[in-house]
Amino acid sequence: MPGMLRNLIENTFLVVGALFPIVNPIGNTPIFLSLTKGLSGHGRAVLARMIALNGLVLILTSIFIGTHILAFFGISLPVVQVGGGLVVISTGWGLLRHSDDDDASDEDKQKECHEADYSKQAFYPLTLPLTVGPGSISVAITVGANRQEGSEWRWTLIAGMILGSLVIAASIYLSYRFAERIGRTLGDSAMNVIIRISSFILVCIGVQILWNGLSTLLRTVLPR
């Protein structure tokens, strides 16, 4: 039993340690606030729950059947990184060019939205690529591909990966659920600066993901 418990904890921390820095829900909070201006606290709570559930499904799918999905469509991981990197760059660039006048206009429009309309943006862009983007998916697929198929504690491996994914989903929910409180604490001016910086970092992350995939593809065609 001690061996099983230790193996369970190790697998849980493997998933959390690999994914949390990339998912970075706390760092994404300012961008989440920017994209949901005008929504009520209840609306953000609904969105936070939906994004956390969407993220959980994406992570678990990537871990357990991600390699099989890519193989079925004949897609390599570097190609996913190139395509995903372009999407992340586009999202970050759009946020970076978002003016304060646009924010005010969006806020007026979003105040008129019914809560049922929140689901339209819950998956794209709030879950994918903002929260669980191509970088997170690539890491999750890699973690799943490297799992030990013949492990003595097979159930602890599966349970640990599920628990680790649940921890990531919970961190997403809590960060986004209390995003408005964080925004009030920092103030509008500070949040605006943080949003711009976060958007620029998002563009840089997209470029890095794109380059990781592109450099891998180039090595297969260029002479050494």
Predicted segments with their positions:
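Small-residue-enriched transmembrane helix starts and helix-helix packing motifs
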Residues: 1-21, 105, 109-127
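Juxtamembrane transmembrane-helix termini in multi-pass membrane transport proteins
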Residues: 11-63
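Structural signature of hydrophobic alpha-helical transmembrane segments
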Residues: 11-28, 77-86, 158-172, 224
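Transmembrane helix exit motif
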Residues: 87-110, 205-216
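Membrane helix-loop-helix hairpins that form the core translocation module of multi-pass transporters
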Residues: 45-99
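A small-residue-rich subset of transmembrane alpha-helices
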Residues: 41-67, 147-183
